[in-house]
Amino acid sequence: WSKNNGGAIPPNMLQIPNTESNSHYLKMCKLLGIKGHPARFPAALPEFFIKMLTDESDLVVDIFGGSNTTGMVAERLKRRWLTFELSKEYVAASAFRFISNETVASDIYSKILSDEFAIIE
């Protein structure tokens, strides 16, 4: 496994630092007084697998969406994506991964919680 095979076989251990505590998502949660998802992981983790297993425009599905790190990475890598999450609060807060404006983020968060239709562009 330690031999470089030119990418044919991925390594059996990924070394990815967890810098999630400095993320835009958490900053927006704190700014708006919202509790963020407790089990976040670094974007480099889904990025590794999305790049290895999919091509642009492929569909990425995350059945335990949480704060939607996987959806954010899939979007950035030009993949289509679906995310499922039981907690409406986590779904609403996951919009922060795609929004930089505090006022817009607060509005989208409220709309999702009140079952209003919201489009993030």
Q: How would you name each of these model-derived features?
A:
Residues 1-121:
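Class I S-adenosyl-L-methionine
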